[in-house]
Amino acid sequence: KKAIEDGSYGPSFSKFKEALKYGNDFSIITARGQSPKALKDGTKVLIDMTFSDEEKQMMLDRLRGSSIDEYLSLQDYHPVSSDEFKEKFGAEGGAENPEIAKTIALKDFTSRVVDAAKELEGNPEFNGLSVGFSDDDLKNVELAKEFIGKELKNSYPNVRFLVYDTSDPKDTKKKRIVIQKS
């Protein structure tokens, strides 16, 4: 709450808020060790404190009958240093190797949204699927680019992947890498 009250947002805040307003699926993948519930609860606080009434209504309209709480419960929260992450995915990665753990979480999220999008393929309004990943650590950005290019693009050739380097919060747009089929 203090960061919100101080207006101290992360470099991807506007993109995250946009995803929330449109009711897009998302995953919070962080090296931190708090519980997934803490991330979910924090997201709810963020909505409550930063969304105008109009933005909340737009979000509810996009959720087609689901409540904000139901929507948030369907999303992925992967603090890769948490006990919950280790229980779900095993010892690989975690606090000892958060870069690898983040790729495991990204693969899990991508698999979930690709499976969910299969229901939309016949819908004329469906324009395809994009998955975005942002990080403020250049090592994680490079590893994500490599992982997407070598593994995820082979498994999901029709998905458009975007990687955002947020190491310089003033220059996130210029550091957007698009990885799609050639």
Residue ranges and their predicted role:
Residues 18-21, 43-52, 111-114, 125, ...:
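Short, surface-exposed basic-aromatic patches at helix termini and helix-loop junctions that form
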Residues 1-96:
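Alpha-helical substrate-recognition element adjacent to the catalytic core
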Residues 92-112:
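Alpha-helical scaffold elements lining the catalytic groove of polysaccharide deacetylases
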Residues 105-138:
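Conserved Lys-Pro-Asp/Glu-containing loop-to-beta segment of HAD-superfamily phosphomonoesterases
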Residues 27-29, 130-136, 162-166:
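Extended hydrophobic secondary-structure segments that form protein cores and membrane-embedded regions
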Residues 135-149:
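Acidic, divalent-metal-coordinating active-site segment for phosphoryl/phosphodiester hydrolysis
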Residues 35-39, 139-143, 172-173:
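Short catalytic/ligand-binding loop motif for oxyanion handling, primarily in non-cytosolic enzymes
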Residues 143, 157-182:
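C-terminal accessory extensions appended to soluble enzyme cores
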